[in-house]
From Swiss-Prot:
InterPro entries: UPF0060. Belongs to the UPF0060 family. One of its GO terms (cellular component) is plasma membrane. Its main location: membrane. NCBIfam families: PRK02237.1 (NF002586). This is UPF0060 membrane protein KPN78578_15550. Keywords: Cell inner membrane, Cell membrane, Membrane, Transmembrane, Transmembrane helix. It is found in: Cell inner membrane. Pfam families: UPF0060. It comes from Klebsiella pneumoniae subsp. pneumoniae (strain ATCC 700721 / MGH 78578). The keyword Transmembrane applies. The chain crosses the membrane at residues 6-26, 29-49, 61-81, 86-106.
């Protein structure tokens, strides 16, 4: 379970970086050269999703829980926004959903 969660976390970081870099270009006037690492991050994101031993839809559903937590971590660390009790509660619920889905992978 820990290996799966860490893999989902790495996957989420790649997806967030792959979305954040073009955001910097479009919203903040950063160089369009950021599209090069964007493409690499998104390609790595897709590849990482293929490393899970479950059906793709089940992987995407479980991944969503870790993505929510990673995005909130990004909100705190990169954007400098303090998390609210609602953020923490939502992250806990999303992570519980991910754990339930992953626990059932071998039983499906």
């Amino acid at each position: 379970m820990l290996k799966t969660t860490l893999l989902f976390f790495a996957t989420a970081l790649c997806e967030i970086v792959g979305c954040y870099l073009p955001w910097l270009w479009l919203k903040r006037g950063a160089t369009p050269l950021l599209l090069i690492p964007t493409a690499l991050a998104l390609a790595l994101f897709v590849w990482l999703l293929t490393l899970h031993p479950a059906a793709s839809g089940r992987v995407y559903a479980a991944y969503g829980g870790v993505y929510v937590c990673t995005a909130l971590l990004w909100l705190r660390v990169v954007d400098g926004v303090k998390l609210t009790h609602y953020d923490w509660a939502g992250a806990a619920i999303a992570l519980c959903g991910m754990l339930i889905i992953v626990a059932g992978w071998g039983r499906a």
